[in-house]
């Protein structure tokens, strides 16, 4: 995939390791300090512009590791792939998982990131709807057309 000049592209190695392995690869490609904020978003979220509005609407707390959305259907749940995190907190959580399990390949994001001190923003299910099924795709196509 081509990306604009100045954009860093990262991919887990080997490919297909899951979202947490992708986050790990992305962090490794960045040259940022531990207190810098990193936005993590799922690639199958067509409504990402709206998601960012909720995540960045207010300053983040000094003592928190990040902010995530809480929404979904049929019951709301923490959306760890729709969040903004301190780079150091992400790195620490991933490094601890690697130390315990040898790798984050195939490991669930929730399993590793749920221990972080996160602020949560409650949103409707539509805000964080992703594309997992043909019905999801049809819903987004009707909404974006």
What kind of feature is each model-predicted range?
Residues 1-106, 111-127, 134-138, 144:
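Nucleotide and nucleotide-moiety/phosphate-recognizing core
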């Amino acid at each position: 995939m081509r990306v604009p000049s100045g954009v860093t592209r990262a991919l887990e190695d080997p490919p297909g390791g899951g979202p947490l392995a992708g986050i790990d690869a992305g962090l490794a490609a960045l040259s940022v300090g531990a207190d810098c904020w990193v936005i993590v978003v799922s690639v199958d979220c067509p409504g990402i512009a709206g998601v960012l509005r909720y995540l960045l609407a207010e300053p983040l707390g000094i003592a928190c590791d990040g902010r995530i959305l809480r929404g979904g259907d049929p019951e709301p749940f923490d959306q760890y792939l729709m969040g903004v995190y301190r780079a150091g907190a992400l790195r620490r959580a991933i490094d601890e998982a690697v130390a315990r399990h040898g790798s984050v390949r195939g490991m669930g994001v929730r399993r590793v990131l749920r221990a972080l001190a996160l602020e949560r923003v409650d949103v409707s299910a539509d805000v964080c709807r992703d594309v997992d099924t043909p019905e999801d795709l049809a819903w987004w196509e009707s909404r974006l057309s």
